[in-house]
């Protein structure tokens, strides 16, 4: 039995994930924080809609204005970007990866056979906390443990650094030319030479080795780890180079939502990928738009005369799932707190225990965000989060309330929530029953919302499984094609 104990990282709710920037080859971005007030004003997004999409365009315009009024980027998600220092640059073809700058939890040195560590990875003791640590004339770390490197440096006599894609609390990600593979460009995650980050990286490596060996051709769309090595105490993981994250595409498209046909294609791939994890007795635990990356994020731009603006439309909706550092096997120790706030399932908030269904809840949240351009659970407070759920999905089931240890959220088996408080008014103003978020009431939109509603079932035992989701009528058009 696996019982690798995880230590809770103090910045759990303020973490960025390893996936989104870490594999990205092109578009360095300004960090999402209180100090960041610009929203890529230079971007010229594209979308193309048919008349049958009803009032999609008008509703999207209203959603966009409402969304910006909420200062979503600066106020609702900035805490997931602490330590992230991206920079903007442009190239002919956009591609992207995500930085995972702090792990939700780190496994201890006890591990199962599946996670048996590779013997060739040398172990390094904790190093002194000097302002600048030097091991040799050419190998230096800064005061935080980041490897000091620059364009032109070569790792392992093979990977020539082209540029830094981003930095985070965990380390940095660089784009490299792989001289051992005919000059192919790759993304290399260079983890800080700090014990907890090395352990987190090795944990991710073990999961990736398992998944990549089980699915060597990436049929199930988990990011491919090409290799890993130790560079003077820094764990370095080499990944394929991918495109923008789905979150960044939305952001750079002025938070316009995806077309429903694209949502269908992306949703099917996500369900297939995470179902593959579930069949391998794994739960991802940190699914969100930042951790879903496009293989190529190329797009076409067209002018929308109705909205009087340029909009972007994807050329290819192929995706990969990234960030397996928090993935947990069924028989491992399960940390009490998992998932990024906006995508956290009710059983996690209520400390009722969790397993694979928490991933399904996260996917439901992701799909509604793809549809609207913003997340419906915009909060950092657990009680407010539960109030939003009740406003959107109806009352929390009594049996879940009675079982939870989180009694502080309830009074007489009802959510202890004042609808007339400022927070109560905020929730009432911003949230509404799920179906009222529909932008069009044609059959395909109805099918999507039926799928989302089944994914957002409170009781994890009643929540749709991904095997069942893949058979949902929303995906019938894909099967016909």
Swiss-Prot record:
ATP binds at residues 165-173, 189. TG003 inhibits its kinase activity and affects the regulation of alternative splicing mediated by phosphorylation of SR proteins. Its main location: nucleus. Residues 8-24 have a biased composition (Basic and acidic residues). The keyword Hydrolase does not apply. It comes from the Eukaryota. One of its GO terms (biological process) is regulation of RNA splicing. Its EC number is 2.7.12.1. Residues 1-46, 102-143 are annotated as: Disordered. Residues 159-475 form the Protein kinase domain. GO terms for molecular function: ATP binding; protein serine kinase activity; protein serine/threonine kinase activity; protein serine/threonine/tyrosine kinase activity; protein tyrosine kinase activity. Expressed in liver, kidney, heart, muscle, brain and endothelial cells. Dual specificity kinase acting on both serine/threonine and tyrosine-containing substrates. Phosphorylates serine- and arginine-rich (SR) proteins of the spliceosomal complex and may be a constituent of a network of regulatory mechanisms that enable SR proteins to control RNA splicing. Phosphorylates SRSF1 and SRSF3. Required for the regulation of alternative splicing of MAPT/TAU. Regulates the alternative splicing of tissue factor (F3) pre-mRNA in endothelial cells. Belongs to the protein kinase superfamily. CMGC Ser/Thr protein kinase family. Lammer subfamily. This is Dual specificity protein kinase CLK4. It comes from Homo sapiens.
